[in-house]
Amino acid sequence: MTPPMHTRVRNYFADASLTDGFNTQLLVWNDTGNLSDKFMVFRPNGGSSIRDELGAEYYVMVDVIGAKGNNGAVDERVQQIISTIQNNPISDSCLGYIENFGGIPAPVLTTEGRLVYRLQFAIKYGE
C-alpha cells in the first residue's frame, strides 16, 4: 500500500533533516507535557479529486510547534522549511511537485506559551 500523502511529506521533511530536534506526529498533536519538546504534526488538508491513472493535487498542513520560551528557534525552522521546499520542489519521486501556499501565516500561542505556525503545502502527484 502506498503511504498517504501527509506521511510522504513527513518522510520528505525527515530526509531533508527538517524534522531534526522535533517530535513528529501524524493527524493530531499529542502534547508530551514537557514544555521543552518541539513538534511537527502532519495532516491531510483536502485537495482535488483523486482519480485512477490521473494526477491530483493534495493539500497537507504542517503544524510547527515550538518549545516554550524558544520562539526564535521555531521561527528559524519555519524559514528553513520554506527555503528548502522553494529550492527543491521536485526532489522526491514519492511526492511529485511540492510548493508552499498561503505563505507563512501569523503564528499563534498555545495556552502554555508555545509558538505555533500552521504551514500549508500543495503536492501535485500522479502515477
Residue ranges of each PLM-predicted region?
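Charged, amphipathic alpha-helical segments and their flanking helix caps
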Residues: 1-23, 41-127
